[in-house]
Amino acid sequence: MDFLVYHRDRPGSGDLRRALVEEHWSYMDGFAETMIARGPTFDESGEVLTGSVHVLGLPDPAAAWRFAFEEPSYQAGAYRDVLVRRFRNDLGRTMWDFAGGRDGDDRYLVIGWGPAPGTEPVVPDSDDLIGCGALLSDDGETWLGTAVLVRAAGLDAAREVLAGRRYDAVEVHRWHFGGRRTEDQG
């Protein structure tokens, strides 16, 4: 089963996050085979780290919580909170399959929270989708929202990916492809 784990930074933790980047990557290396998407989020300026999102396959909710709470930056106090949700990979692929490449400052994480459990919308239709899926209850039975990784011309354009659908709230975060870069990735 797949999960979205979004660690959100506490204010002023950027230096700590940068100091722990190698420990973070080493920890994530242990989950590389099951990783669907990963990467840091930033404020509107694109300069200040605000979090770290991971979408990956794990055996059960308990394993997802262990993944979230054993992460080195979490253990060191860099994060203010963590969101752990079951995830349905509606695109059926990983971020590395995205034809638009991994470079660019025009990538975003968009999370739409549903108005009432069970009113699930359709998957947005766009060649700019890097990742997309339903956020679900722990038992996987109830739709709670939608998470999208998208290439867009700006924050407003990213928000439009979920426009016209029924959401109580939509949050948009600048996002970059994460993980170690190998020679063939640039």
Identify what each model region corresponds to.
Residues M1-G186:
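Conserved, structured core segments of small domains
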